[in-house]
Every structure is written in C-alpha cells, then in structure tokens.
C-alpha cells in the first residue's frame, strides 16, 4: 500500500508447504495488468515443472480476476485459496464511493473449470476489508 498499489497480496506454496514466491499488486506502476496473481503464474511457468505447478497452492487476499484466473489455468497451477471474493470487493468499492472494475467479475471456476478453489475466508476477509478502507482513505479524497 505504501507504494500506492491496491492492497492485494499472494503467496505461492509448494505441496510440501514451502513458500516459493510471493508478490503484491503493482498496478500503481501505470500498467493495469501487473496483478500479483498473473506475476506468480509467470514466475511458476519459468521456475517450476508442470507437476510442481499442479501440486502448488496460491493463497491470495482477493479472488482472482478473469485475467489472473486464465493465467493460473494456462500454466496449470493447482488450488487457489482466497480471503475475500470479487463480490465482496465490489460491495466495498461501492460503499467507499469507488469506481467498479473495468472487467466483469467471473467466478474462477467459470474461467478454469475443474480447479479446486476455497474462499472466501470470513476471518481474513474482514482484515482485507480494513486494508481496502485504509487504502481508499489514504489515496482518495472520498475516504
């Protein structure tokens, strides 16, 4: 958040529980495609075998957008666990007076059929909600 990026973060974890990579949103760079889930998918494609990717889990603060879900599916990553849903994010943005995302939200399984997805996680979703409130208050005139 300190860099001006929306408060999203993800961790890529191997089947044995080893943290392989982590990243944060970088859309503040001016490139709206610099989503952390997309970056982790690219990292996984370059650094993991197909078997390792399939056995890995991505833990993320927010449900993948369609672009990131597609990247996840194309590289063959395994399970996704997300703290807050796209539906929750849309409600928070409305509550904060923010603009809706430019791309329609789709459930991850609509983009990547058959993938194992868990979320939202209620206890963590509240923490993500608080981060979005703090971000919006800091970087907008409306909070």
Question: What is each model feature region?
Answer:
Residues 1, 73-143:
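Zinc-dependent deaminase
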Residues 61-79:
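Local cysteine-cluster metal-coordination motifs and their immediate loop/turn environment
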Residues 8, 54-57, 115:
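Residue-level recognition of the N-termini of beta-strands and the immediately preceding loop/turn
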Residues 3-7:
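Short, flexible loop/turn motifs enriched in small residues
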Residues 8-17:
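Short beta-strand scaffold segments in enzyme catalytic cores
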Residues 28-43:
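A short, polar/charged loop-to-alpha-helix boundary motif
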Residues 20-27:
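Short beta->alpha transition motifs characteristic of CBS
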Residues 50-62:
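Immediate flanking context of iron-sulfur cluster ligation sites
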């Amino acid at each position: 958040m300190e860099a001006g990026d929306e408060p999203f973060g993800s961790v890529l974890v191997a089947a044995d529980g080893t943290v392989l990579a982590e990243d944060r949103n970088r859309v503040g760079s001016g490139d709206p495609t610099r989503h952390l889930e997309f970056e982790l998918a690219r990292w996984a494609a370059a650094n993991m075998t197909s078997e390792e990717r399939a056995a890995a889990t991505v833990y993320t603060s927010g449900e993948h957008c369609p672009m990131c879900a597609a990247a996840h599916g194309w590289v063959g990553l395994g399970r996704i666990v997300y703290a807050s849903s796209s539906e929750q994010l849309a409600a928070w943005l409305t509550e904060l007076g923010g603009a809706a995302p430019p791309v329609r939200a789709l459930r991850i399984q609509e983009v990547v059929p058959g993938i194992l997805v868990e979320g939202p996680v209620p206890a963590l979703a509240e923490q993500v909600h608080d981060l979005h409130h703090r971000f919006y208050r800091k970087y907008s005139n409306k909070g």
